[in-house]
Amino acid sequence: DRLRSRGLGDVYKRQVENHAKAGRSARTYLDEGRWDKIYHALQPGDFVLIQFGHNDAGDINTGKARAELPGSGNESKVFKMEKTGSYQVVYSFGWYLRKFIMDVKEKGAVPIVLSHTPRNKFDNGEIERNTSSFGKWTREAAEAAGAYFIDLNKISGDKLQDMGYNQGLRVVGTYFNHDHTHTSLKGARMNARSIADGLKATDCPLKDFLK
């Protein structure tokens, strides 16, 4: 329907398996066994787009308990989970991304890592960026593990910024639905085009499928 939130994976034309799950961080995506299903199904030559960051801040062992340690290094820490009383080793955000990348490469598939999509949030007329946090850590993880990296936050963020904050949020707002994070179909198409733009700037063979 018209008001349904749409993700960028909803608007591809090539055969795509969309395994995204709302509300998951890199850590909880792994903990829930969702990544294992992808790993075991991977075939040589598959392309795997990996994006996290929207749900990776916040509480580590209380509340939603889905955050990771900040950064892209090998840091880890043991936490006692409030809900279960069990203990869990939590790693850095970048550690989880590097694991996903290495798993994909182990299967002969091609990892493509994306910084997360921009939110409809402005500060003094400038759209919010993630260049000093999750976007930075995503880039670092991709470079460290040898994956293709697309700075989707910058590419789509630049497009939204160019629409002009001074026009008001009405124009930019049409790319989002009921909140500042989830995009409309129009926003999903914009982000998909941004991925295509980013792919064209790489030597990733997936770009050969683009029109």
Question: Model-found features: residue ranges?
Answer:
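Short glycine/serine/threonine-biased micro-segments
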Residues: 7, 18-21, 51, 185
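A short beta-strand-loop structural module common to alpha/beta enzyme folds
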Residues: 13-25
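Alpha-helical cap/lid subdomain in secreted, periplasmic
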Residues: 37-182, 189, 193-211
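N-terminal hydrophobic targeting/anchoring segments and the immediately downstream early-domain regions
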Residues: 10-15, 44
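Single conserved hydrophobic/aromatic residue that forms the stacking wall/gate
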Residues: 1-12
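Catalytic nucleophile-elbow at a beta strand-turn-alpha helix junction centered on a G-D-S/GDSL motif
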Residues: 5-6, 25-26, 55-57
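N-terminal post-signal-peptidase region of extra-cytosolic proteins
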Residues: 25-37
